[in-house]
From Swiss-Prot:
Protein's recorded name: General odorant-binding protein 19a
Compartments reported by the entry: Secreted
SUPFAM superfamilies tied to this protein: Insect pheromone/odorant-binding proteins
One Pfam family cited in the UniProt record for this chain: PBP_GOBP
Its job: Present in the aqueous fluid surrounding olfactory sensory dendrites and are thought to aid in the capture and transport of hydrophobic odorants into and through this fluid.
Alphabetical UniProt keywords: Disulfide bond, Olfaction, Secreted, Sensory transduction, Signal, Transport
UniProt record similarity statement: Belongs to the PBP/GOBP family.
Disulphide bonds in the chain: C40-C72, C68-C126, C113-C135
Tissues in which the protein is found: Expressed in adult olfactory system. Expressed exclusively in a subset of chemosensory sensilla on the third antennal segment.
Length: 146
């Protein structure tokens, strides 16, 4: 139920998107990201706003709490489900949630990282989320994360 409410909030925050332009503005992208962050941060009280800001800036610590916070965001983005990378849904979400200027670079990075979670166990440390985000950070020039 909370996820459906979040999707409605994200859709409202994005506003109408003209059919001729599939992407969103950077402002809309960051607004949607803030909503995700606002849902996931309270679930992981050991992850401070400062740590979340550092993750957004590409400094990705490897600890259970930060990995599970990252997992929460990636699940909301439909990029990971139960520790497994969801290539098709990630590509669909990318087309909806990123400005057009980001898409080619992200499509390449996503395809390079599609196997980064293979063989990793999700419980108890959310390791696949850390592996996926680290791979994306290393393979995408303009890294963005809420």
């Amino acid at each position: 139920m909370k996820f459906h409410l979040l999707l409605v909030c994200v859709a409202i925050s994005l506003g109408p998107i003209p059919q001729s332009e599939a992407g969103v503005t950077e402002e809309q992208m960051w607004s949607a990201g803030k909503l995700m962050r606002d849902v996931c941060l309270p679930k992981y009280p050991k992850v401070s706003v400062e740590v979340a800001d550092n993750i957004r800036n590409g400094d990705i610590p490897n600890s259970k709490d930060t990995n599970c916070y990252i997992n929460c965001i990636l699940e909301m983005m439909q990029a990971i489900k139960k520790g497994k990378f969801q290539l098709e849904s990630t590509l669909k979400q990318m087309d909806i949630m990123l400005p057009d200027s980001y898409k080619d670079e992200y499509r390449k990075g996503i395809n390079l990282c599609k196997d980064s979670t293979v063989g990793l166990k999700n419980a108890p440390n959310c390791d696949p989320a850390h592996a996926l985000l680290s791979c994306l950070k290393n393979n995408i020039k303009v890294f963005v994360f809420p």
